[in-house]
Amino acid sequence: THTTVTYRELIETLRQRTEITYLVAEPRTIQLGGAEIQVLPLLPPGSADLNNRSVGLVVRYGAFSAFLSGDSEIEELTFWVDQEVVPDVTLLKAPHHGGADAVTSEFLERAQPEVVVISVGVNTYGHPHPEAVQAYEAVADMVMTTREQGQVTILGYSDGRYEIRTGGV
């Protein structure tokens, strides 16, 4: 977990390094072998919550796709829906550990994930929130948490198939 002071110190250190080309995500597409990584636009400056400055990625490998959203909450998810950058995906890494403040019906209607993985451990925040889990279960064929399954590895294939491996709680 970062603090605002730590975050600002990191940014200042990066700014002092001349080999750094960019500091924040700029919307772009990166080709990586047979895969494509789409870096989503950031919210315009002004959000008070650093979670809503998370980098969003859509990873595509042929017919397999994954949406990775970091700690994004409703404000950033709504922004991405409004920007029309949320595609149908095979896999969704649940935003903000499955928090109630990080899921909207509009976002899920756009993403239509087959599998949702919630990265979460024992915590005092109540993550994942039962309402968020219920929303994921309404659209996805499978909802998994790392608290229950341990490490979750998804192997995606270009024909759209995928394998799920779990273990090591």
Go through each PLM region and give its residues.
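Non-globular, low-confidence helical/coil segments that flank catalytic cores
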Residues: 1-169
